[in-house]
Swiss-Prot record:
Site (Positions ribitol 5-phosphate for the nucleophilic attack): R157, K214
Transmembrane segments: none
Known function: Catalyzes the transfer of the cytidylyl group of CTP to D-ribitol 5-phosphate.
Family matches, as Pfam families: IspD (PF01128)
Catalysis performed (reactions): D-ribitol 5-phosphate + CTP + H(+) = CDP-L-ribitol + diphosphate
Organism of origin: Vibrio parahaemolyticus serotype O3:K6 (strain RIMD 2210633)
Keywords for the protein's UniProt record, in alphabetical order: Nucleotidyltransferase, Transferase
Protein name listed in UniProt: Ribitol-5-phosphate cytidylyltransferase
Sites annotated Transition state stabilizer: R14, K22
Coiled coil: none
Length: 238
């Protein structure tokens, strides 16, 4: 089984003046989370979707799933206190319902510009190498600074990548490291890749696209709108 685990547990504090969590903001009468879910719904290799949602909005999400005919979502469950805990909750639900050898693609509900090719590459990488993290090369230079804002090192861009999503693993492996982290009282994982590498797993790079952005601010939302408008214009005018 190939299962998408979609994290929609944030409340979007960086979205100024918004009364909705960022995943429920609408573009052309369609919420961001639905744009995201449609990509996995339409991918022929995805068998099921589990969504971890901020709890007060679960009923609203279920209404959206019905309205937009999203049929692959099998379960919507409440998130935890942190992103790490929310992902763990979702993984435990997948464990209850699916095989331990399932491939799990962990993706942000506010990353709607994912495409079929990236989804398929993630699945193939897990089956070939046991893991996958979607990345793209940086276009600017990273510098390492100290506590006094003095540059201490300049990273080689050719050896750097921007971490994106999906981040994909066998269910048995990602659950194992989450449980180990809980035993160790480790709660500071930035994402699934950082948790896997902390506990000694190699994570294989998968090529992504720069427009696969995470919508966390008003600027991100306007970039998303511009990309959607461009895609629509290309379909109409060629």
């Amino acid at each position: 089984m190939n299962v998408a685990l979609i994290f929609a547990g944030g409340v979007g504090t960086r979205m100024q003046n918004s009364t909705k969590p960022k995943q429920f903001l609408e573009l052309y009468n369609k919420p961001v989370i639905i744009y995201t879910l449609e990509k996995f719904e339409e991918n022929k290799n995805i068998d099921a979707i589990v969504v971890v949602c901020v709890e007060p909005w679960i009923d609203y999400l279920r209404k959206l799933l019905f309205k937009f005919d999203i049929q692959k979502v099998k379960f919507v469950i409440p998130g935890g206190e942190t992103g790490q805990e929310s992902i763990f909750n979702g993984l435990c639900k997948i464990e209850e319902e699916f095989d331990h050898n399932s491939v799990v693609l962990i993706h942000d509900g506010v990353r709607p510009l994912i495409n079929d090719e990236i989804i398929n590459r993630n699945i193939e990488a897990v089956k070939s190498h046991g893991s996958a993290i979607t990345t793209c090369p940086p276009v600017e230079t990273f510098v390492l600074v100290d506590n006094e804002d003095v540059v201490k090192d300049v990273h080689d861009r050719s050896l750097s990548r921007l971490a994106k999503a999906p981040q994909s693993f066998y269910l048995r492996d990602i659950l194992k490291v989450h449980r180990q982290a809980r035993e160790d009282c480790y709660t500071e994982a930035i994402d699934s890749c950082s948790l896997m590498t902390k506990y000694g797993y190699d994570v294989r790079l998968v090529s992504g696209i720069s427009e696969n952005i995470k919508i966390t601010s008003p600027i991100d939302f306007f970039i998303f709108k511009a990309i959607i408008d461009t895609q629509e214009n290309l379909q109409v005018f060629g």
